[in-house]
């Protein structure tokens, strides 16, 4: 065969020549001959012949070898050479020679191969038939050269196979095997017959050799056989065995697998699998581990390996048994390979495995587990358990199709080596079969517990078994509880207390607790025994325990906590189930355990946690009146146990309870205990817990626990049944609490307190408990009571001051004998508390409550009263406190001033006025002076001993002695300087905008300014009314509603009446006219009553207030006939009668404001009626027309002021002047007849007078008539001499009574007056008033005083004059001159007009109306009471702005008084015109008025009020026009406004099951006995039909029976309350929704709800727009009640709903009423927020505003009636500099004041 390379090169050369690219190839023959042919010469042959020596031959052979490799020999040269050297191959020849010849042959074959031809066979034969087996390598080299490394066997084919077999016997080397590989690959067909033998020999070589290289090459040969030939079947077993063994060589693993894979891919593949399986099963190979391992490997890899042969159809089922057989003899390697193989099978082809396969696999796993017991192979153990885990994962994924029972048996067999997760699965599987449907399930459970709980150490496994046990118990306990507890629980869990694993202990304990909770058999005690052992573990840490290990150690005690908490749950269940003894034992165990805590001083955090939760539960225990114990559910509703009581059972009560109701199931609702002798009540005495609580208070070191106990104790103490049914010592509790506050050790022992913890926090926690303990005062020792009050006093200096004040207020009610001793010091201590918003309401309500307990402060000295005022005054500051607090402060001041002892009051007036000035007035001022007054310190350091002199008094103003003058003027000055200068401060002030936001929650932005203004006015008016109140009560205790006695009615019947407006008071003077005597003489009194000053018109009767307290006392005796009753409904007390406009037609008041009686309202008088038509002229003069009647000389003075009315009845003691012209006109006969009649009447009159003067002033009577008169009868004093002595004695007796009450008969009191009061009015209340004004005429009109300089402070602005309507001519140009102000502190100045400009009131000229509202500056001054002269003040005083000035009002640009503003008295023309005009005006009515007998009221008024120079126009009294019905109505409406506040409170009764039903509550017609007792204490029962709605405030209740027959009302000095009681109102069938009741109850701001339902009453149950606050009264046992407040969310800032008071039945009505009244005051303030401009006023403020509006209207009327008067406009209420730039500075006013007035006033102008 030619060499391929030469062929290739030849082809390339030919291709190049063909394409013309290469040089033409020369003739090869010629080329060979010329270039490469080597000629074998004879010489060469000779050198090679035998003749030459061996060495020469060998040398030559070497040279020819070199040539033969490179050059071609000539033809037949090779044969020649071979012939020459052939002999050298003989065996006897030297080795070198043989090797040289073989090398020559190799060279010739390599170099001359193409030309050898048949010589190749020759050479092959030489090698094959070599005489010896030597020279193998060289011969092999020649063979490799001949066959081109086995590829070409030309001429060698026939003998090649024999040569190979021969050679394999003698020279089987790796070199030959490599040649053999090529022989098989390229010439396999020549080897077929001998291939089996070759394979056998190679296999043997593989087995026998140790050379990996030989084996690798042998594998290459075998691979070539398999791939290029056909492996004989008979060679297959050996072939497989060889590979199975060879595969164990690590380096040959890959080629072996490749060879096997090639084999398995042939037609022998299945046979090979079979052979390998046979090998695994053959017992002969059982010990041959490498062989079995290889077989397992090949089978596994071939059938389910990574490169499996899909051509093989063997299933795992067919080969796995062989695997199983291969494990017959334990061998680690084989087992390992089998595990790897089947793990690979399971992971890859788990879904294809059938049940049979899984069975075999489980058999294999089982045998593996058996082998693990004998084979100590960690690797095998690991991989086997991994296999089990793999199968387990398949089970979890539901992909295991074998027998789970079989598998879990295997797992259980090796459970000790299995991981926890596997055992958890095993236990879960086992638990599925533990149920009653399985035979022996309890035994199985017991076995499971024994195997995996008692014998197992791993916690997770044991916990899992406990879960199984718990589940089994949960499912089957209802029917098998007995067996399970007996056989399993007690036997398996009895050792739990000693168990080492705390987690297992904890869970086992929880299991026992859960089981015990529902266990009702005798086994319950067995379970509790185990739990008790768990609880007995010590909670003390070991001494060597470090801090960082505390948490870990605490965790080991969790089972104790579980046991205790479990007992709490058990107790909660056992309370309501039988037998009751179970609850008793649990309760005792709990208490005993907590006692251990304090006995051994457990301080670990877990111990504190146990105590915390135990107390948290135990302090929820409650008891009802039947002593049944109960616990609140999650909704807070307490359910009481029918089987457990809180005391040691008594047979009587026990039997009574047994028969009280039917048998109820344990889980049913609470009810009476079931009947029958088997039922036995359990005793759970609270005293056990109580003792532990005492230990806690004394020893507890954890603040959280102590705080919880203190926080829960107040509510527990409400249930007195708990305390009193077993021996609980409240004395010890009180001692423990007090020692906590007083002892220093409490804070030292506490730990766990928050940062910054102090004694204050301790007080905050303890004080509520002490407050709750007050209700036990009857069971406390007096010492303990005092100690408790002392602790509360100490708390006043801490943050808990508000709670302490509330507690002390309860003490005041419940423990008066204790508090009365501590109260003087306590009140002084209260002054040290800073005035803060949080303290305001508790403190003021405490003082308000205390004021109504006069027995507590009857021993108060001045210091205590001063302290009360010092406490209250700072809260009148409107810039710091809301409106409710300010109003409440004023209420407290008024109450305490009235209740203050009379001798002290005078000194407190400057004290209070100074406080009001500093807190109220300065709060509206921008000056720094505002903050310079500290109410508390100043109040106590400057106690009011006497009035101080503010300015030196001015001399020469009166005729009084110097000392008295000094006293009077200094009093006035001090009063003016300290308190009355309201105007002085306010005019300069600016309203702080913060006031509105502080007091008005919902103010509209547009009304903020108006609200500010109204709010400012409100606080100033509060101040005015306060000062007015003090002036009223400073020297007397008379009530605010006078009652005219029957004798007074007789004396004054038909008398003449005039009313003056003096400051902020209305002074009405009524004089007698003698109609009583006329009737005695047989004359008709109707003649006199038909005149112009008749009192028959209902519009002129003085009306009493609607709610007269005196009426409440005298109503039973008064049955007044009434006409048709009109229903009077009111939204809030008294507001229905508030006067908005004063010019309301009289017809609107006929229904409700007319006097009861037969009188009818006459038609309105015509405006221009003539005198003749009004008064019939008598044609004949008789006795009655001229004789002074017996009743003449009497006068009544009625003063109406904001805080009430005062009335005096006085007689004129002056005899009639002998120079009277009237006497001369009287016939002597008629005069004597009259005197005789007087003597006959004397005795009767004397008796009547004494009786009348002995009637108390507080009783009510028909109001006096108000006839008007403009003339003074000159004969009015004639009768005085006849009864002068009698009257003098009578009045003196009255005076002495007053003097004795005041206690100062010898001194002249000095009065400090409120705004708008003159000294003379105040003097009317003094002892000297009767002597000075009734019996004395020392001040006569003839005694002219010298004019003195007056300071002019008021200025007027002349406006366009109004032209008179009469005749159309302009009126005389008149102006008035401002004088000294009258009312120093009038905060709302109105225009005050002189009567001389008004002219005679009787003149009825038509006047025009001005459209703009006209106002004037109001100023004030003082009046000297002794001389009735108006003294100058000299203090800068300006009126408070009220509204913006009209822009059209001109002012004097020069700042001086404008011309025409005043007129000089020296101008005769003007003065003459005025006098002439006035005379002409008065002349028309004088003749008629003079005919009316009696003293003209002007005479009386002038004696009291006249001064030669009043000063300012505003100081002058203003006479109300008699003819104007609108002014009469205004006065009448003022009388309709009560002089004290009114409140209406709803009272509801909530019965059992009614807490959520409005209809049921409103349908109640009666309540419980305790409810009835409560109503009785609320007030006085009144019968509605006997009540006059205008006398008694009923809050809208009908008096005709529409709203029932009775109700309750209550009153004190300054307020009256009526109670709308739902159960006293009729329940009508037609009114199904109870609307008749709800129209009253739904409109009441505050409701007292007597909640007897046992459930919570929620706000909103009674639906109403105005139900702001509920006072909830919840009756408790032992005659106690819980009183709490509920309010709407928008009221939360005003009412403190956190306060709950425990009050006894005896004091409940008082406390509930007080809380309701305070809440109603707050509600009225809140209600006013909806309209910020309608600030809530008290009735006093309403009266004050009404009087001020009346003054303003009178001034406006004066301006209309006198067009020549320049109208005086007041400055605006807004900031003057900004809005009225033309207003002059104060400096101008000061200058004006220094100008003297050069005129003397004409007093007839205002009378």
UniProtKB/Swiss-Prot annotation:
Q: Consequence of mutating residue 1547 to I?
A: In FCORD2; somatic mutation; decreased function in negative regulation of TOR signaling; does not affect interaction with TSC1
Enumerate composition-biased segments (Pro residues): 663-675
Q: In which tissues is it expressed?
A: Liver, brain, heart, lymphocytes, fibroblasts, biliary epithelium, pancreas, skeletal muscle, kidney, lung and placenta.
Q: What is the effect of changing residue 1651 to S?
A: In TSC2; greatly reduces the ability to enhance the RHEB GTPase activity
Q: Which SUPFAM superfamilies match?
A: ARM repeat, Rap/Ran-GAP
For the modification Phosphoserine, which residues carry it? Answer: 540, 664, 939, 981, 1130, 1132, 1155, 1337-1338, 1346, 1364, 1387, 1411, 1418, 1420, 1452, 1764, 1798-1799
Name the reported effect of residue 1462 to A: Inhibits insulin-stimulated phosphorylation and activation of RPS6KB1
What is this protein's function?
A: Catalytic component of the TSC-TBC complex, a multiprotein complex that acts as a negative regulator of the canonical mTORC1 complex, an evolutionarily conserved central nutrient sensor that stimulates anabolic reactions and macromolecule biosynthesis to promote cellular biomass generation and growth. Within the TSC-TBC complex, TSC2 acts as a GTPase-activating protein (GAP) for the small GTPase RHEB, a direct activator of the protein kinase activity of mTORC1.
Q: Which disease is it linked to?
A: Tuberous sclerosis 2: An autosomal dominant multi-system disorder that affects especially the brain, kidneys, heart, and skin. It is characterized by hamartomas (benign overgrowths predominantly of a cell or tissue type that occurs normally in the organ) and hamartias (developmental abnormalities of tissue combination). Clinical manifestations include epilepsy, learning difficulties, behavioral problems, and skin lesions. Seizures can be intractable and premature death can occur from a variety of disease-associated causes.
**Protein name from the UniProt record:** Tuberin
Write the lineage as a comma-separated list. Eukaryota, Metazoa, Chordata, Craniata, Vertebrata
């Amino acid at each position: 065969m030619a060499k391929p390379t030469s062929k290739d090169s030849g082809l390339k050369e030919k291709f190049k020549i063909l394409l013309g690219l290469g040089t033409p190839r020369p003739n090869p023959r010629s080329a060979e001959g010329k270039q490469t042919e080597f000629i074998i010469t004879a010489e060469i042959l000779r050198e090679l012949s035998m003749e030459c020596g061996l060495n020469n031959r060998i040398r030559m052979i070497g040279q020819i070898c070199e040539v033969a490799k490179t050059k071609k020999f000539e033809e037949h040269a090779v044969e020649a050479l071979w012939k020459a050297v052939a002999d050298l191959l003989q065996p006897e020849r030297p080795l070198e020679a043989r090797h040289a010849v073989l090398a020559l042959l190799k060279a010739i074959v390599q170099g001359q191969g193409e030309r050898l031809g048949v010589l190749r066979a020759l050479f092959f034969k030489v090698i094959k038939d070599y005489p010896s087996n030597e020279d193998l390598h060289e011969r092999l080299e020649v063979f490799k050269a001949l066959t081109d490394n086995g590829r070409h066997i030309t001429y060698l084919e026939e003998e090649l196979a024999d040569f190979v077999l021969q050679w394999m016997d003698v020279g089987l080397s790796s070199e030959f095997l490599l040649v053999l590989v090529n022989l098989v690959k390229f010439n396999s067909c020549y080897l077929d017959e001998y291939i089996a033998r070759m394979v056998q020999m190679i296999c043997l070589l593989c087995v026998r050799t140790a050379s990996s290289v030989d084996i690798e090459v042998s594998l290459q040969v075998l691979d070539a056989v398999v791939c290029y030939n056909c492996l004989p079947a008979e060679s297959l077993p050996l072939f497989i065995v060889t590979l199975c063994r060879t595969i164990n060589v690590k380096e040959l693993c890959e080629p072996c697998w490749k060879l096997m894979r090639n084999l398995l891919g042939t037609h022998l593949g299945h046979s090979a699998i079979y052979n390998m399986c046979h090998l695994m099963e053959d017992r002969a190979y059982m010990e041959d581990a490498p062989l079995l391992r290889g077989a397992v490997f090949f089978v596994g890899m071939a059938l389910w390996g990574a490169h499996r042969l899909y051509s093989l159809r063997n299933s795992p089922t067919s080969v796995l048994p062989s695997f199983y057989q291969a494990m017959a003899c334990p061998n680690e390697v084989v087992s390992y390979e089998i595990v790897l193989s089947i793990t690979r099978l399971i992971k890859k082809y788990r879904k294809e495995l059938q049940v049979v396969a899984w069975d075999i696999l489980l058999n294999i796993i089982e045998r593996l587990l058996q082998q693990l017991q004998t084979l100590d192979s960690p690797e095998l153990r690991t991989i086997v358990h991994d296999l089990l885990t793999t199968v387990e994962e398949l089970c979890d994924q539901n992909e295991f199709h074998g027998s789970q029972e079989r598998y879990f048996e295997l797992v259980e067999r090796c459970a000790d080596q299995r991981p926890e997760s596997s055992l958890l699965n095993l236990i879960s599987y086992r638990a599925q079969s533990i149920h009653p449907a399985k035979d022996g399930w309890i035994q199985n459970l017991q076995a499971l517990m024994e195997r995996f709980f008692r014998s197992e150490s791993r916690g997770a496994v044991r916990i899992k078994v406990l879960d199984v046990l718990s589940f089994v118990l949960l499912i089957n306990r209802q029917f098998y509880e007995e067996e399970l507890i007996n056989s399993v629980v007690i036997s398996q869990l009895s050792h739990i207390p000693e168990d080492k694993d705390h987690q297992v202990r904890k869970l086992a304990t929880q299991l026992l607790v859960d089981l015990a909770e529902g266990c009702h058999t005798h086994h319950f005690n067995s379970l509790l025994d185990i739990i008790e052992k768990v609880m007995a573990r010590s909670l003390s840490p070991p001494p060597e325990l470090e801090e960082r290990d505390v948490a870990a150690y605490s965790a080991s005690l969790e089972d104790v906590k579980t046991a205790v908490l479990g007992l709490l749950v058990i107790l909660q269940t056992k309370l309501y189930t039988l037998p009751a003894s179970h609850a008793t034992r649990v309760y005792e165990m709990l208490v005993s355990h907590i006692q251990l805590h304090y006995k051994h001083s457990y301080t670990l955090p877990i111990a504190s946690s146990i105590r915390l939760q135990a107390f948290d539960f135990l302090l929820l225990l409650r008891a009802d009146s039947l002593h049944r114990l109960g616990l609140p559910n999650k909704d807070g509703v307490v359910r009481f146990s029918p089987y457990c009581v809180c005391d040691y059972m008594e047979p009587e009560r026990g039997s009574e309870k047994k028969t009280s109701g039917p048998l109820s199931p344990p889980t049913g609702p609470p009810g009476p205990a079931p009947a029958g002798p088997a039922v036995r009540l359990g005793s759970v005495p609270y005293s056990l817990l109580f003792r532990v609580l005492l230990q806690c208070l004394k020893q507890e070191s954890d603040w959280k626990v102590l705080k919880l106990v203190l926080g829960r104790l107040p509510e527990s103490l409400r249930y007195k049944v708990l305390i009193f049914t077993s021996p609980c010592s409240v004395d010890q509790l009180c001692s423990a609490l007090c020692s906590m506050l007083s002892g220093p050790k409490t804070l030292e022992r506490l730990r766990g307190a928050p940062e910054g913890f102090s004694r204050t926090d301790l007080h905050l926690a303890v004080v509520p408990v002490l407050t709750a303990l007050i209700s036990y005062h009857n069971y406390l020792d007096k010492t303990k009571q005092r100690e408790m009050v002392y602790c509360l006093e100490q708390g006043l200096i801490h943050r808990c001051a508000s709670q302490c004040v509330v507690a002390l207020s309860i003490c005041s009610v419940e423990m008066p004998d204790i508090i009365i001793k501590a109260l003087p010091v306590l009140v002084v201590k209260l002054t040290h508390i800073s005035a803060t918003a949080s303290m305001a309401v508790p403190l003021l309500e405490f003082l308000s409550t205390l004021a109504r307990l006069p027995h507590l402060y009857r021993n108060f000295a001045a210091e205590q009263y001063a302290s009360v005022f010092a406490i209250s005054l700072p809260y009148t500051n409107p810039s710091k406190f809301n409106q409710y607090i300010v109003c409440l402060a004023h209420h407290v001041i008024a109450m305490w001033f009235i209740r203050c002892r009379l001798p002290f009051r005078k000194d407190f007036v400057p004290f209070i006025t100074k406080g009001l000035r500093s807190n109220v007035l300065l709060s509206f001022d921008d000056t720094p002076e505002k903050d310079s007054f500290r109410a508390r310190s100043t109040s106590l350091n400057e106690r009011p001993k006497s009035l101080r002199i503010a300015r030196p008094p001015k001399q020469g103003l009166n005729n009084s002695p110097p000392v008295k003058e000094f006293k009077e003027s200094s009093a006035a000055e001090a009063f003016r300087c300290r308190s009355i200068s309201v105007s002085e401060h306010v005019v300069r002030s600016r309203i702080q905008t913060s006031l509105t936001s502080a007091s008005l929650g919902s103010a509209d932005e547009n009304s903020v300014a108006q609200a500010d203004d109204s709010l400012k006015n409100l606080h100033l008016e509060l101040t005015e009314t306060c000062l007015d109140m003090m002036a009223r009560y400073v020297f007397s205790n008379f009530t605010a509603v006078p009652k005219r006695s029957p004798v007074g009615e007789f004396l004054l019947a038909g008398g003449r009446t005039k009313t003056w407006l003096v400051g902020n008071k209305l002074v009405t003077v009524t004089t007698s006219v003698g109609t009583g005597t006329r009737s005695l003489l047989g004359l008709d009194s109707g003649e006199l009553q038909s005149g112009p000053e008749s009192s028959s018109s209902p519009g002129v009767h003085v009306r009493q207030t609607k709610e007269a307290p005196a009426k409440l006392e005298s109503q039973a005796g008064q049955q007044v006939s009434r006409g048709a009753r009109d229903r009077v409904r009111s939204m809030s007390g008294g507001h229905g009668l508030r006067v908005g406009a004063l010019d309301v037609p009289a017809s609107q008041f006929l229904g409700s404001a007319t006097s009861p009686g037969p009188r009818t309202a006459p038609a309105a008088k015509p405006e221009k009626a003539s005198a003749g038509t009004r008064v019939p002229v008598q044609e004949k003069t008789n006795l009655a027309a001229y004789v002074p009647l017996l009743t003449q000389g009497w006068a009544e003075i009625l003063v109406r002021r904001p805080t009430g009315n005062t009335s005096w009845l006085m007689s004129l003691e002056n005899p009639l002047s002998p120079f009277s012209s009237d006497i001369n006109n009287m016939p002597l006969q008629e005069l004597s007849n009259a005197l005789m009649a007087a003597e006959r009447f004397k005795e009767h009159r004397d008796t009547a007078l004494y009786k009348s003067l002995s009637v108390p002033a507080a009783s009510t009577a028909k109001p006096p008539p108000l006839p008007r008169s403009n003339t003074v009868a000159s004969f009015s004093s004639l009768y005085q001499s006849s009864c002068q002595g009698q009257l003098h004695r009578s009045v003196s007796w009255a005076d002495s009574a007053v003097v004795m009450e005041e206690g100062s008969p010898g001194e002249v009191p000095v009065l400090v007056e409120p705004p708008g009061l003159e000294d003379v009015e105040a003097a009317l209340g003094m002892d000297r008033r009767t002597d000075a004004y009734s019996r004395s005429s020392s001040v006569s009109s003839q005694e002219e005083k010298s004019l003195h300089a007056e300071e002019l402070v008021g200025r007027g602005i002349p406006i366009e004059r109004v032209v008179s309507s009469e005749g159309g001519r302009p009126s005389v140009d008149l102006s008035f001159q401002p004088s000294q102000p009258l009312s120093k502190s009038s905060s709302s100045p109105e225009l005050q007009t002189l009567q001389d400009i008004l002219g005679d009131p009787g003149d009825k000229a038509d006047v025009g109306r001005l459209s703009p509202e006209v106002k004037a500056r109001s100023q004030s001054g003082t009046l000297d009471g002794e001389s009735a002269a108006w003294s100058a003040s000299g203090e800068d005083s300006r009126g408070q702005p009220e509204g913006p000035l009209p822009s059209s009002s001109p002012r004097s640009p020069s700042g001086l008084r404008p011309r025409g503003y005043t007129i000089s008295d020296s101008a005769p023309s003007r003065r003459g015109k005025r006098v002439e005009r006035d005379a002409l005006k008065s002349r028309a009515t004088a003749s008629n008025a003079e005919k009316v007998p009696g003293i003209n009221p002007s005479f009386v008024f002038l004696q009291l009020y006249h001064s030669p120079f009043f000063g300012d126009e505003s100081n002058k009294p203003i006479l109300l026009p008699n003819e104007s019905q609108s002014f009469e109505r205004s006065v009448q409406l003022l009388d309709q406004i009560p002089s004290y506040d009114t409140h209406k409170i709803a009272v509801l009764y909530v019965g059992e099951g009614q807490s959520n039903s409005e209809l049921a509550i409103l349908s109640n017609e009666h309540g419980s006995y305790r409810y009835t007792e409560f109503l009785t204490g609320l007030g006085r029962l009144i019968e509605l039909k006997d009540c006059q709605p205008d006398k008694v405030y009923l809050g809208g209740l009908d008096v005709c029976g529409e709203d029932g027959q009775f109700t309750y009302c209550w009153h004190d000095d300054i307020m009256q309350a009526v109670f709308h009681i739902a159960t006293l109102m009729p329940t009508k069938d037609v009114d199904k929704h109870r609307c008749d009741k709800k129209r009253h109850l739904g409109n009441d701001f505050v409701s007292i709800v007597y909640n007897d339902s046992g459930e919570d009453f929620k706000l909103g149950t009674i639906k109403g727009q105005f139900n702001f606050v509920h006072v909830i009264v919840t009756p408790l046992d032992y005659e106690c009640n819980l009183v709490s407040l509920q309010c709407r969310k928008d009221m939360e800032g005003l009412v403190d709903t956190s306060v709950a008071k425990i009050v006894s039945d005896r004091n409940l009505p008082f406390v509930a009423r007080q809380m309701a009244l305070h809440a109603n005051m707050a509600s009225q303030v809140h209600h006013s927020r909806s309209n910020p401009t309608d600030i809530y006023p008290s009735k006093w403020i309403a009266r004050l505003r009404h009087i001020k509006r009346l003054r303003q209207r009178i001034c406006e009327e004066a301006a209309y009636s006198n067009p020549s008067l320049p109208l005086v406009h007041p400055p605006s209420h807004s900031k003057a500099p900004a809005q009225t730039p033309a207003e002059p500075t104060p400096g101008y006013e000061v200058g004006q004041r220094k100008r003297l007035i050069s005129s003397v006033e004409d007093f007839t102008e205002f009378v």
